[in-house]
């Protein structure tokens, strides 16, 4: 629509009518009577016979007041030369006040009005919204005072002139004019509707004199103090405020500003629940995102569907909830259903995982000769992102989802007809991606559409509950062939998902599979400079070379890592009674929160142990578990000792109780439909797991015995090392003292609260390991000299069985690079297993999933859906302008990478402060306990 000018033209007099001497003098006469709008319609046509001049309707012919003849020049009106005034209104307010105080006479410049024409909006600007005015022009000299003082007066054109000398608005009675003739590029870009060398017209107010209380207009030109309230802003004490030019100062902390002063406004509107009572709404995507869509008109890419779920995840399918894939005609067949679980991980880790998944989908679409995949293969893959708690999600992750078009905060609500919302579900098919560096990737880079379901739980109910939403709420609606589990931070290689799916496709007996977990090394493998990361990289690689292939050969993997694993959907189904089976036994671990589960049941559910056993030993089935080496997933491993200990403590709890549970239920293998050879192989694997459990239990004592034997060998006459016995005695007592200290640390101190205690113990064990390796090398050299002695054979066998197997197997697997980059770090950190074992034993009672808490209260910051029946009222952010503003804010936050956030986001929470206080008390208790033990030890030595 055209941008209509709102300023009336100036009053022009005919030369034949002799003006009075007071015409060019300052006008002191009272204001003219009000103009009757209905009797004299206004027009913007400069060639019309009737024109509004100064609040009167004048015809070409005679003056309505004096009867004098008038004429109006069509293009070159006569210029009016104004006389000097005491204070010019063209000065900014503060300079005008200063000039008035000093008594300075400032001349007024002549006014050169030109006819006003309606200026169309620029083509690059969106169409105006009548409900959301354009607030791009800020508060200025003229309109600020009117905002603050006279609510009855009209809002005249505000000045944005950069000149400190004069203002470019000139007020004459009730008509305001712009007299500048120089092009103002700033006004043109801001959409003020001004053309070069043109004038913008302002309509007069409805019978009010707009100069009443306008401090920007001098009294000689009709301006005067307000007759009904003081010219200024009164503060709380009733005194004049000094901020009347800019408005009152905001109270309290000012949050992050939006692009528009309107912010994200929720507008109350009526809505209709669906036939099953769910509140679902289709939200338009941002305008900027719609402009870059590769294919226009696709409904699933034009809108984002939001649904507020108020039921338990187990009751979602029975309640009649449907996804977009169920609404198509015909319903889409889902081959792969991928879940990405997250808590509070940062945006880089999230985008790295999602980008890896989208590259895998692009690879599936590129397999043109496949009977399953091809050009439209993306329609057979659905990605489900489950966030554990709305308040716990990283805000930058939500910005990334909003940038992709998946998430819109303005659509969410807290309750639906007094029923609390348990999960917010967003559905959208995005055509773009964000890589790990938060850079957009478009379809020209190989990105294909991706169907995304974003389920954000209202409360933090831990990871096992996130899997329950995936398996019990969404998977039954899609009935996928294969379900893939991913954690945020694990990036699958471009072909990994295909290789995982292929393992199920070529062998119908495969019920579960896992890929190779590798550490994320970064560019040029710079992460390996951290010895802790290098040690984990070596451990992961050796597990994928030795352990996983052996277990896959037998047909049963003790643990399928939740970070990167896949399951056949029909293999996960429970038994006929519905109370037993893989999923039922797995989700029994959620009873930990209700106090209905014992310690043993709580620990075995950590690593999905029962799920693995139930699939392999499922009655009347012959499912096997496979390891797929070609499917590689890079995970972000812990790079600090506190994070490493917290993670491995959970893993050790799961693996330890996994072995115990598997051994206790070995007889269930004979109830399955496996062949006799397969059952025999599984029994042999059970024996292997039993021996491995025994060695793990005695690993602490075995390491100490090995240390004592090697260091004591240096005391022999063959080495002739002076005073080596003193050094060995100190090392042994230090070893035992460190073990006792680790027991105390493990039982009373968190790794996050006492990092230096754990670091000191680990570094001391690494020093003792170095001493032990030196002793082993010296003993080996001495044994080589006596090659015919029995000790040589024992030494060679022991070294080959421990370290030689790593080197030989790595070269046989044609993957030896970790031997050259990570072997030394792994050997030095090998004693950390002692600390982890002590931590495991000391924390058997702790069934929490790390440091992640849970919410207990229902929030009420999003509004509510209220009404009777299916017709309800709800407050939503549905205006396109506000949606575009929110989208631009998300893009800005991604670009800033979270460098500028609200201070409240960085403030420590109350729970964190309380935990820090508890850690301080625990450190004091541990220090006192260690001091008492040392004093008691010295006292016993003195007595002896």
UniProtKB/Swiss-Prot annotation:
The keyword tRNA-binding does not apply. Its EC number is 2.4.1.16. It comes from the Eukaryota. Glycans are attached at residues 3, 326, 603, 653, 927. InterPro entries: Chitin_synth, Chitin_synth_fun, Chitin_synth_N, Glyco_trans_2-like, Nucleotide-diphossugar_trans. It is a multi-pass membrane protein. Coiled coil: none annotated. Keywords: Cell membrane, Cell wall biogenesis/degradation, Glycoprotein, Glycosyltransferase, Membrane, Transferase, Transmembrane, Transmembrane helix. Disruption phenotype: Abnormal capsular morphology: lower fiber density, abnormal fiber distribution, decreases capsular diameter. Decreases extracellular vesicle secretion. Sensitive to high temperature. Pfam families: Chitin_synth_1 (PF01644), Chitin_synth_1N (PF08407), Glyco_trans_2_3 (PF13632). GO terms for molecular function: chitin synthase activity. The chain crosses the membrane at residues 690-710, 726-746, 761-781, 791-813, 827-847. GO terms for cellular component: cell septum; plasma membrane. It is found in: Cell membrane. It catalyses: [(1->4)-N-acetyl-beta-D-glucosaminyl](n) + UDP-N-acetyl-alpha-D-glucosamine = [(1->4)-N-acetyl-beta-D-glucosaminyl](n+1) + UDP + H(+). GO terms for biological process: cell wall organization; chitin biosynthetic process. Induction: Induced by high temperature. Repressed by the antifungal agent caspofungin. Residues 901-917 have a biased composition (Basic and acidic residues). Disulfide bonds: none annotated. Residues 13-22 have a biased composition (Low complexity). Residues 1-49, 901-920 are annotated as: Disordered. Polymerizes chitin, a structural polymer of the cell wall and septum, by transferring the sugar moiety of UDP-GlcNAc to the non-reducing end of the growing chitin polymer. Belongs to the chitin synthase family. PANTHER family: CHITIN SYNTHASE, CHITIN SYNTHASE 1. This is Chitin synthase 6. It comes from Cryptococcus neoformans var. grubii serotype A (strain H99 / ATCC 208821 / CBS 10515 / FGSC 9487).
């Amino acid at each position: 629509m055209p941008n209509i000018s709102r300023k009336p033209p100036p009053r022009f007099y005919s030369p034949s009518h002799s003006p009075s001497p007071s015409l060019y003098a300052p006008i002191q006469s009272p204001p003219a009577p009000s103009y009757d709008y209905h009797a004299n319609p206004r027009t913007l046509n400069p060639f019309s016979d009737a024109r509004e001049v100064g609040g009167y309707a004048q015809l070409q012919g005679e003056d309505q007041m004096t009867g004098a003849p008038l004429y109006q020049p069509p293009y070159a009106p006569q210029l009016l030369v104004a006389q000097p005034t005491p204070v010019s209104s063209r000065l900014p307010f503060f300079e005008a006040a200063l000039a008035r105080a000093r008594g300075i006479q400032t001349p007024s410049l002549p006014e050169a009005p030109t006819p006003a024409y309606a200026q169309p909006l620029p083509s690059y600007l969106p169409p105006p919204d009548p409900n959301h005015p354009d607030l791009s022009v800020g508060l200025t000299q003229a309109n600020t005072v009117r905002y603050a003082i006279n609510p009855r007066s009209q809002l005249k054109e505000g000045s944005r002139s950069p000149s400190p000398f004069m203002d470019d608005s000139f007020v004459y009675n009730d008509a305001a004019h712009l007299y500048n003739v120089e092009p103002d590029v700033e006004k043109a870009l801001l959409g003020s509707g001004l053309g070069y060398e043109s004038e913008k017209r302002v309509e007069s107010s409805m019978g009010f004199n707009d100069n009443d209380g306008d401090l920007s207009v001098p009294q000689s030109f009709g301006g005067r103090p307000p007759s009904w309230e003081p010219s200024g802003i009164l503060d709380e004490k009733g005194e004049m405020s000094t901020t009347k030019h800019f408005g009152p100062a905001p109270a309290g902390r000012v949050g992050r500003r939006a692009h528009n002063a309107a912010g994200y406004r929720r507008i109350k509107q009526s809505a209709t629940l669906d036939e099953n009572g769910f509140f679902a709404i289709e939200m338009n995507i941002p305008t900027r995102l719609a402009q870059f869509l590769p294919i226009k008109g696709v409904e699933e890419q034009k809108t984002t569907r939001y649904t507020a779920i108020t039921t338990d995840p187990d009751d979602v399918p029975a309640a009649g909830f449907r996804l977009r894939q169920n609404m198509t005609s015909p319903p889409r067949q889902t081959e792969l259903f991928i879940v990405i679980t997250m808590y509070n991980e940062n945006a880089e880790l999230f985008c790295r995982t999602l980008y890896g998944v989208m590259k895998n989908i692009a690879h599936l679409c590129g397999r043109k000769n496949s009977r399953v995949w091809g050009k439209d293969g993306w329609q057979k893959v659905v990605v489900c992102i489950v966030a554990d708690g709305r308040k716990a999600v990283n805000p930058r992750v939500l910005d990334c989802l909003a940038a992709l078009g998946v998430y819109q905060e303005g659509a969410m609500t807290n309750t639906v007809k007094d029923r609390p919302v348990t999960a917010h579900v967003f559905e959208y098919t995005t055509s773009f991606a964000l890589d790990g560096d938060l850079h957009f990737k478009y379809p020209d880079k190989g990105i294909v559409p991706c169907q995304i379901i974003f389920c954000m739980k209202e409360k933090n109910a831990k990871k096992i509950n996130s899997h329950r939403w995936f398996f019990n709420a969404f998977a039954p609606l899609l009935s996928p062939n294969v379900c893939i589990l991913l954690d945020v931070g694990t990036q699958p290689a471009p072909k990994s998902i295909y290789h995982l799916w292929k393992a199920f496709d070529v062998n119908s007996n495969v019920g579960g599979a896992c890929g190779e977990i590798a550490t994320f090394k970064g560019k040029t493998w710079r992460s390996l400079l951290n010895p802790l990361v290098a040690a984990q990289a070596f451990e992961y690689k050796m597990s994928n070379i030795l352990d996983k292939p052996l277990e896959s050969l037998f047909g049963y993997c003790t643990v399928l890592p939740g970070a990167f694993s896949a399951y056949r959907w029909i293999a996960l189904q429970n038994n006929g009674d519905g109370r037993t089976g893989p999923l039922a036994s797995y989700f029994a671990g959620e009873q930990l929160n209700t106090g209905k589960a014992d310690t043993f049941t709580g620990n075995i559910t950590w690593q999905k142990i029962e799920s693995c056993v139930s699939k392999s030993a499922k009655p009347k089935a012959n499912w096997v578990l496979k390891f797929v080496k070609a499917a590689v997933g890079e995970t972000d491993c812990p790079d600090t000792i506190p994070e490493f200990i917290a993670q491995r403590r959970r893993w050790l709890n799961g693996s330890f109780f996994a072995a115990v549970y598997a051994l206790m239920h070995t007889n269930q293998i004979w109830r399955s439909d496996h062949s006799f050879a397969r059952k025999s192989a599984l029994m042999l694997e059970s024996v292997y797991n039993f021996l491995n459990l025994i060695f793990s239990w005695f690993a602490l004592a075995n390491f100490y015995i090995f240390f004592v034997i090697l260091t004591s060998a240096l005391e022999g006459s063959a080495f002739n090392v002076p005073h080596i016995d003193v050094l060995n005695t100190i090392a042994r007592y230090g070893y035992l003292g460190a073990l006792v200290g680790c027991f105390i640390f493990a039982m009373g101190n968190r790794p996050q609260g006492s990092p230096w205690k754990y670091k000191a113990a680990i570094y001391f064990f690494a020093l003792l390991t170095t001493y032990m390796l030196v002793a082993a090398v010296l003993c080996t050299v001495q044994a080589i000299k006596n090659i015919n002695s029995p000790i040589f054979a024992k030494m060679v066998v022991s070294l080959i069985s421990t370290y030689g197997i790593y080197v030989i197997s790595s070269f046989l697997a044609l993957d030896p690079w970790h031997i050259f980059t990570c072997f030394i770090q792994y050997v030095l950190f090998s004693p950390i297993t002692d600390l982890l074992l002590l931590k495991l034993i000391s924390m058997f009672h702790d069934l929490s999933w790390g440091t992640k808490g849970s919410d207990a209260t229902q929030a009420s910051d999003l509004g509510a859906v209220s009404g009777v029946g299916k017709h309800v009222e709800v407050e939503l952010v549905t205006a396109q302008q506000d949606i575009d503003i929110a989208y631009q804010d998300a893009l800005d936050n991604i670009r800033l990478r979270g460098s500028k956030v609200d201070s409240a986001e960085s403030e420590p929470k109350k729970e964190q402060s309380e935990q820090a206080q508890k850690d301080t008390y625990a450190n004091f208790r541990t220090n006192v306990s260690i001091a008492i033990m040392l004093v008691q030890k010295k006292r016993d030595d003195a007595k002896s």
